[in-house]
Amino acid sequence: MTPADLRQSPPLPPGGPTARTVLQLQGVGKRFPGVVALDGIDLDLRAGEVHAVCGENGAGKSTLMKIISGQYRADDGVVLYDGAPVQFSSATDAQAAGIAIIHQELNLVPHLSVAENIYLAREPKRGPFVDYRALNRAAQLCLQRIGLNVSPTTLVGALSIAQQQMVEIAKALSLDARVLIMDEPTSSLTESETVQLFRIIKELRSEGVAILYISHRLDEMAEIVDRVTVLRDGRHIATSDFASTSVNEIVARMVGRPLDDAYPPRRSTPTDQVLLKVRDLQRTGTFGPVSFELRKGEILGFAGLMGAGRTEVARAIFGAERPDAGSILLGDTPVEINSPREAIRHGIAYLSEDRKKDGLALAMPVAANITLANVAAISSRGFLRFADETAIAERYVRELGIRTPTVAQIARNLSGGNQQKIVISKWLYRGSRILFFDEPTRGIDVGAKYAIYGLMDRLAADGVGVGVVLISSELPELLGMTDRIAVFHEGRITAVLETGKTNQEEILHHASGRSHA
C-alpha cells in the first residue's frame, strides 16, 4: 500500500473502546551496535484516542516514534497502517500517508514566516513562483483551526516557544495528519500555555485524530490520556486504561520497582560557612539589584515564573552575561568574573537548561565530554594521555551510574538522563565548589530524576565544601530538594524562604509580585 492509497482512506470515527485501530505494531524490534533498542514491541493506536507512551530515558520511546514516523526501519516485526503492512522509507513518506511528528526540539526555520514554515517545500505555486496570497490564506485557515492568533506573515523566530509549538501542530494539520506523535509537548510551556495545548488535543481527538503522546509528566496526563503503554529496557511492560491506573503503578512499571518517594532522603546539612555572596548585582532591563548568599552544604532554590530573571542571574555569576553593577564574593574575597573561563577557574559551574546546546559536545565520546573542562590535567607536553582519560571517565561512569556500553560511546546516542550525568561528571572532575543546576530534570524520566536528586544531595553532603543552586519551574522539586528558596519576580528577589516552613501557595504569592502589592 502506497502513501497515496493511505491518504484516500475513509474518515476515522471518534475514539473509544470500539474505535477502529489505525496503527498497529506487532513484534517490532530495532538494534544498534551494542544495544537492543526495541525487543518485540506490540502496540495499537485507535482513531480518536490519546495514547501515552511512558518509560525511563533509554526505554525505547524515541526509537519507537522514529520507526512509526519513517525515520528508522524496524529490524523485526511489522507495522500495520489501516490494517495493511507498511515500511516507510523516510519521514516524508510517512507524512504523505498522514503520520506527523512534533519533536521536543522544534523543527522550524526561524527566519521564515509562519506560513512558509507550515507549507515548507509544499508551497502553492503560480507558474514557477510561490503564490504567497494562496500560501498565507491556507496558513491562516490552519491557524484559525487551532486558535493561534498570529499573522501568517510573522517570522517564526519572533514567536514564543509555545506559539512555535502551535505552528508545528498547524503544520501537522496542513498535512491532513490522521496520526499525530507528540514528544514532550509541554516541557517548555507555562501552565496557561499547557491548558491551551490540551484544548487543541481534545479537539483533534474529537475529530478522530489518533495521538501518540510521549511525556514524563504523569501528573498532567489524567486530563487528556485514554490509554497508557509502559516500556522498559526496550520491552513492552503493560498497556492499560489511564483512568484505572494510578501514577504509582505507572512509575513502578517504568522503573521495575515500587518508588515510594519522589525525592531521596536528604543527608546534607548547611553549615555557617558562606561560599558565595552576591551583593546588589544588576543588569539594566534584565534583573536586579539582586543579593543572596550560598552556604557550604546547602541546596538553595531559585523559584519564579518564566522570565523572572533566575537564569540570567546565574549566567551573570558564571560570566556568560556582563552585569552593570554589583559584586560577587567567594567567602569574603571579592572577585571579578568577566567570562565563563574565569568562573570555572574560581570553582563555579553552570549546568545549562539546554544541555545539548551548551553542556555537551554531542559528536564526541563520553570520555572526552567528562574531561573536557580539565583537559590540562590529563595532558603532557601538549599531548592527551588517553589511558588517563579513559580511567577517569570510567570512574565517573561507575560512581554516577551512567548507562553507556563504553566510554567511547558518542554522547548523542545516550538518553537525556545519562547525558545530564555526563555534564555533572564534567564539573565534578573540574573540582567545582559552586554548582548552578538550571532545570536539571527537564525532559528526563522519573527514575533519572531520582538519581539526579541523589547526586545533588551527595555533592552537598560530601564535606568537600560544595554548595548547590537549583533553578526549577517545578515547585514540588524545589520543596523536595532545597534548604532555602529565593523567589524571583521581574528580576528581583522578593523573598528568601526556609523550605521546611513554606508551601507552594506562599512561593506563588511572592513569585507573582503580590507581596509588593
From Swiss-Prot:
GO terms for molecular function: ABC-type D-ribose transporter activity; ATP binding; ATP hydrolysis activity. SUPFAM superfamilies: P-loop containing nucleoside triphosphate hydrolases (SSF52540). Residues 23-258, 269-515 form the ABC transporter domain. InterPro entries: AAA+_ATPase, ABC_carbohydrate_import_ATPase, ABC_transporter-like_ATP-bd, ABC_transporter-like_CS, P-loop_NTPase. It holds the Pfam family ABC_tran. Gene3D superfamilies: P-loop containing nucleotide triphosphate hydrolases (3.40.50.300). It is a peripheral membrane protein. Part of an ABC transporter complex involved in carbohydrate import. Could be involved in ribose, galactose and/or methyl galactoside import. Responsible for energy coupling to the transport system. This is Putative ribose/galactose/methyl galactoside import ATP-binding protein 1. It comes from Burkholderia ambifaria (strain ATCC BAA-244 / DSM 16087 / CCUG 44356 / LMG 19182 / AMMD). The lineage of its organism: Bacteria, Pseudomonadati, Pseudomonadota, Betaproteobacteria, Burkholderiales.
